[in-house]
Regions:
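Flexible, glycine- and charge-enriched loops at secondary-structure boundaries
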Residues: 16, 20, 55, 124
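Aromatic-rich, lipid-facing transmembrane alpha helices and their immediate juxtamembrane interface loops
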Residues: 57-59
């Protein structure tokens, strides 16, 4: 379906809007597709899941729907970047999108609150910087597992994301050839 694949932000956006009917349909279609192709995993990737990581009650709802549909387990994976590099990258990206963000104020929020929260009339983003706090809280809320990867290992294995791809693809003959 073109609508489902139109943006890397579509799924997180629908979760944040509590469009659980869309999420259920998306998960159902992908589970059926995986079964039809005799695959053992459905891999969903988006850099925009960070808000769901911070607001873990959304992750719980996502898991509940997936498990109800027949997914056997949910394995969450997260790439953690050096916080200073992450902050500067986010600031540059948001500035390029004409976000009105004061550098000093944003840095203050990161240092004192462990997160950066930005909202507009129709969107809201929350970015975690206090990794220990948010990981602990996420793990307390979810029923699945969480694996974390350093940004450096994520980009330095010949192909960006190779470390994660090798975990998700469980066919030893094909994982290096991907």
């Amino acid at each position: 379906d073109e609508d489902i694949n139109k943006s890397h932000f579509e799924l997180p956006f629908r979760i944040l809007k509590n469009d659980w009917a869309f999420i259920e349909e998306f998960l159902k279609n992908n589970l059926l597709l995986a079964k039809r192709k005799k695959m053992n995993s459905v891999f969903i990737s988006s850099e925009d899941f960070e808000t769901i990581f911070v607001d873990s009650f959304h992750a719980v709802q996502f898991e509940n729907i997936a498990l109800k549909l027949g997914y056997s387990v949910i394995n969450w994976m997260c790439v953690l970047r050096n916080q200073w590099d992450y902050f500067n990258s986010l600031y540059a990206q948001l500035s390029s999108l004409k976000g009105t963000l004061n550098y000093s104020t944003a840095a203050h929020d990161v240092v004192h609150f462990g997160e950066l929260s930005i909202g507009s009339g129709s969107n809201k983003w929350r970015f975690a910087f206090d990794y220990d706090f948010y990981i602990d809280r996420f793990l307390k809320n979810i029923s699945g597992s969480l694996s974390t990867f350093s940004f450096e290992s994520f980009i330095n294995n010949g192909l960006v994301g190779m470390e994660i791809i090798n975990i998700v693809i469980d066919c030893k003959d094909r994982e290096r050839a991907f």
